[in-house]
Structure formats: C-alpha cells, structure tokens
Amino acid sequence: MQRELPRTILSLSRACQEGVDDLDYEIIVVDNGSDPCPMLPPTDPPVRFKVVNVKHPSPVGAMNEALAMAEGQVIGAWIDGARMASANLLAAVRDAAAHHPAPVIAIPNRQLGSARQASAARDGYDQAVEDALLDQAGWPAPGTDLFAVSWPEETSVTGAMLESNALFLTRATWDALGGYDPAFSEPGGGMCNPDMLSRAVAHPDTQLIRMDGVATFHQIHGGTSTSDEDLAVSRVKEATRAYTALRGHPPRKVRDRGWVFDAATGVMDKG
C-alpha cells in the first residue's frame, strides 16, 4: 500500500474533493500491521493515524477500531485502502444523507483500467501501466474524469450489488449493528464486507440509497481478491464456504432497488 494508500488519502482530501468547503469531516487510517508502515501525505483534513496493537490477517478488528475512533454522525467505512474516491463523493454523500434519518449509502465500485484487473493483469496491466493511465488522465488535477479510465464492477446503478467498498451509515446504525463481525477472521476479511452491507440493508428502519455518478476506483496491487485471477477465484471460494458455515446460506447480492441519488442533479429518486 506504499503506492496506493497515499493516492486514496489524497483523493479524499480537500485538495481533490469538490464542494466540501463547508463540510466538517475527518480521515481516519488504522493500519493492520503493514511492514513498512505506509507514508501518508500531508492533507486537509490531517489524517488521524493508528496502528493496531495486535496484527491480524483479517482487517475486521482494524475496521472496528476506526469506527470507534470516528466522531462524525455519518461514518464511511473504507475497507480497501487502494480505492480512490471520485471528486464528488463526499459532497454527494452529505446531500444524500439529508434525505433519510438512517441511510445506507452504498458507493458503486469501479476498477482502474478497461477490464477487471484480475483478468487484465494477464494481458500486461500492472502498476506501471496504471501510473501512466492516471498521468494521462491528469489526476490529481481538478476535473480529472476517472470514470473514463475505469471499469464498473456492477452492471448498473440499480443492479445487484454484493458489496460497497465505501459504505456510509449513521453512528447509531453502526452501533446497532456492532460494526464488522469478528467471526470473519480469514486474510482480507473474507465476506465481511458483503455481510456488512447485507445486515445494514436488512436492519429495521434503514433506507438503502444507491449513488449515481459517484464511485471508488481500485488501484492494482498485491491484494487478496482483485488483482490476480487465480488467487481471486480461490479466495472467493474459501470465503464463500466460510460465510455459508457462519450464516447458513451463501452470500447474497443486494437486489433491493432502494432509492437512487443522482450526484449530478442532486435529485433523489425514491422509486
């Protein structure tokens, strides 16, 4: 994450986020035992950084530590430090959250490049290619269109969704759900993230809000399930077996249409 995390942090800072001059927000990073520890860029707001006391293969403990540290009333969980934010993400979340007292705001997932990275890597897509792609796109200059140089993981804004790598809930909802389930103890957390989205959507009185025109963008790296096809298949199979043993059924994609917030117009479609 020495290469990827600084970009992710920068993408969330005021230097890259648009329409957040009046937004009071914080960026928290809880490191799960990286060696070496990542070097973070100076940003506004400054990063609140912590290293977990006991390193664990699963990020669940680190995620829950970060949730406990958070001081805001709407908290976004970013389980993958390699995912950059679209420039409108925080402003759009702020505006969407105002429409419901208990929103479940699920940001769509995209991957940099023209295809799924686990497949593209076999055709030569690597960090150097991605660096050149971002340079050509002009990032981090204002107005950079990362959508034009990325591939969508979901078929449509209202399509079936297994997980969101930037999930925003209120403090009350996070507390009621108990954060991420520590039972997901395998490397990478297995299906802890799909489980979190599923439980949040099913929780009483919450409202799923899908986001149109907003996304996170995955950078290729040596992670557990995104950048190597054979490893991805193996990890998903292992995680599916573990999830099924824990929950009594395989992971299920969220098919509820929910509400749809258009980030470009600020209009909420309640269906």
Predicted stretch roles:
Residues L12-N53:
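Acidic donor-binding segment of Leloir-type glycosyltransferases
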Residues N88-D135:
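Conserved donor NDP-sugar-binding/catalytic core segment of glycosyltransferases
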